[in-house]
Each structure stands twice: as structure tokens, then as C-alpha cells.
């Protein structure tokens, strides 16, 4: 069908200027099923599918958003032809950006090279899968005609869009702060899309964390109070919190957890860009290892900056009703009774937890990505929303599992000054005490509610993130 499209709609360059309007008119008439001189979205959807023309995700809606100049919900022939001409210019630029050796063909090695400049590494075998979805004649190269035919009615015109499916972040926020920052392309940085995406992610994180705050507070309570002698389970923990402070107490500490999103994201993003510059030469691609090191160091920098808020979040969550009137009161009392050093209790295990979390999170995601591309990417490199969310959630969960003992010790160090009769132990002392009294399972107290919040957090943050991207103009509605 792509061959038919090339011969029928898109003539050779020699006669293109003379015949193109006629060819476009013939295609327009084929789409205009009722012959009223305009094409609505229903006719476009049905016509393109009948012609076997490949479409991207939500392609018809995006075509109408771009091409429907007078916003009457229909495309007349002039709008239709203008859209195709403008779109073809963009496709030509995208093709040239990929054709590194200017031989008029795109090869697998050129796709690998282009993605490397964007900070994304794939194998040549995976690049061949991208080619297979576009290549018509089986040469394992894509010429301009094949490229144009494939993306004629596909709003994806940029190589960055093609591989953006597999960016590690999809707007997921499961409440942790140790993930490696997003990788933004040069175009996103220049156009200002990067800050819109960060803002959308921040809002999604705020909604997601607020929605799952009761489970987060329960996790903290079980980390601090759970032991063999005081077996706090999920239902008992919720009953105890509601009995002590009412329904509203389930969200105690959430305000701090939400407020810290903005400064943490800003510092992490800035630090990540600086560390990348230190670890790579100008214009050089950033590999997976350099990305891991840069991301880990950026996470450590951001955590150093906002760590006092982490301590206050724990103190507010563990505190009893009336103990603190708010964030400011909590900070004032900690400073008065324990001094400035109290704001960094648990800082060492928190920093140590970044390495296993970020490393395993990134490694598992890359492993899942490679497995899907090698085994399931038959006709398209787009894995779909469910696969992306599943990979992101699973990799984050594995990272949490590896770093959880350090997170538990961090939380106990943050809160132990509040517990009457509790000795003020350092990290090593707490590890020894927990293992001797509670065994290895003691290092995983509270992990059940932590895992319980993953699925709702993923779903909520993704939905909010996608809607906010539309609102902020990152994606078309």
C-alpha cells in the first residue's frame, strides 16, 4: 500500500511541482466520501485506514489541530494541501538530520549515531527494528520516498519524537526522590518545553503524593514503631492514626512532601546538567554509565539542599496531634531543642541509598526496554502506554527494594529523638540493633504499604502529567 501511495500521491521530484496539486486533489477526493468538498475527522479516519496509510498515535486529531486553520472542524482542499506541503518540509528537515553522510538514505548506523547525540543509546539491532517499520523494499535502508510515505499523515516528524517513547521518565511519581533526572533534547531546551515538562511533572507529583499520602504516613509509622514487640499491621496502623488524630491526620506531613518537589526538581535538573558537562567532552554523547554517575551526583546535591524538609516531613508524620502547629513550628522546635545538626540526621544512609536505587532503577529499565525491543517490536518501536508505565513502575520498585533498608534506618535516625527512652544511635548502631532484635525482616518494616501505593501513584501521576502537558502546550489537545 505504501508503494501505491508513493506512485499515486507523491510523484517523483522531476514532475512534483507541476503535478502535486492534482495528486493531492485526487487523494482529497478519495477521502471526501460524501463529496461535499470538505473532510471531517470521521472521513479522515475511515479513508486513511481504508487506504492502509500508517498513522501515529492520535494522528487524526493532531492533523486537524494543525491543518484546520479556520477551526470549523473540517478540512477543505486548500487547508488539506497546505498541511501536506508544510508537513513535507518538516519531514525533509528530519530526514536530512538523520542522513549523516548525505547519500540520500538512512541506515541503522545513522539512527544509532543520531540517538547517541540525544543521550540515548541503542544497539544496531534495535535501530534495524526502527528501519523495518519504515522500509518498503527490504534494503534495510530508508530513502526519502519511503520516509515521506511513512510519515505523510503521521505528525511525528522529528527523530526526537520517534525515540521519545523510550525516555526513562513518563511523568511517574511514586513518592521517591532518588530517580535520575529526565534527559531533555537540545530542541526541548531551546523551545522552553523542558520547564513545561518539569512543571507538569511537579504538579502530577503533588497530586499523586497527596492521593497516596495515607499510605506514605503509614509506611513511616511502621518504620519507626514497627517491631516484634509492637507488630503494627496495615489495618491496625490506619485505625491507630484515625483514633489518635482523626481522618485529617492521615495526611500529616504531606504538605512538606509536596512543597519540596519544586526546589528539589530545580536543583536536581541544574546539577545534572553541570555534572554531565564535567563528565563528557563538548558534543560527546553521554553514555549509560556517565548518565548514572551524573544522575546520582545530582540526586545527592538536591538531597543535600532539601534534606531538612525530609527531616521535618518525618517529624510531622510521626508527631502526635498538637505537637506541631505546622512546618514552621516544627522547624523552630527542632532548632531550639536539638540544634542545627538535627536537620541532617540520617543524611549518610540517605546518600548511600541513592547509588543502589538509581543504579538498579536505570539498569532494570534498560533491560526491560532492550527485551521488549528485541522480542516484541515487530511493526513499531512505540511500546504503548501500558508497557512504558509497567517498565517504569517495575524498575522503580526494584530500586526501592534494594535501597529500602537504608531508607528505614534514615527514617529511624530522623525520628529517634522523639521516642522516649530511645538511645541516639548512628547508622551502624541502628543496623546492628535492628538485626539483633528483629532480624533481617526488621529492615523491611513498612515495605508493604510502600508497594501498595505504587500502582495508584503511577496511574494518578501519569493521567495528571499527560493532562498538564496539554494544558501547558507541551502536547496538542
From Swiss-Prot:
Region: Linker region, residue numbers: 159-168
Annotated compartments: Mitochondrion inner membrane
Topology term for the membrane: Multi-pass membrane protein
UniProt domain EF-hand: residue ranges: 19-54, 55-88, 86-121, 122-157
Location of region: C-terminal transmembrane transporter domain: 174-477
Catalytic activity: Mg(2+)(out) + phosphate(in) + ATP(out) = Mg(2+)(in) + phosphate(out) + ATP(in); ADP(out) + phosphate(in) + H(+)(out) = ADP(in) + phosphate(out) + H(+)(in); AMP(out) + phosphate(in) = AMP(in) + phosphate(out); phosphate(in) + ATP(out) + 2 H(+)(out) = phosphate(out) + ATP(in) + 2 H(+)(in)
TM ranges: 198-215, 253-272, 296-309, 346-365, 389-406, 446-465
Role played: Electroneutral antiporter that mediates the transport of adenyl nucleotides through the inner mitochondrial membrane. Originally identified as an ATP-magnesium/inorganic phosphate antiporter, it also acts as a broad specificity adenyl nucleotide antiporter. By regulating the mitochondrial matrix adenyl nucleotide pool could adapt to changing cellular energetic demands and indirectly regulate adenyl nucleotide-dependent metabolic pathways. In vitro, a low activity is also observed with guanyl and pyrimidine nucleotides.
PANTHER family: SOLUTE CARRIER FAMILY 25 (PTHR24089)
UniProt-recorded name of the protein: Mitochondrial adenyl nucleotide antiporter SLC25A24
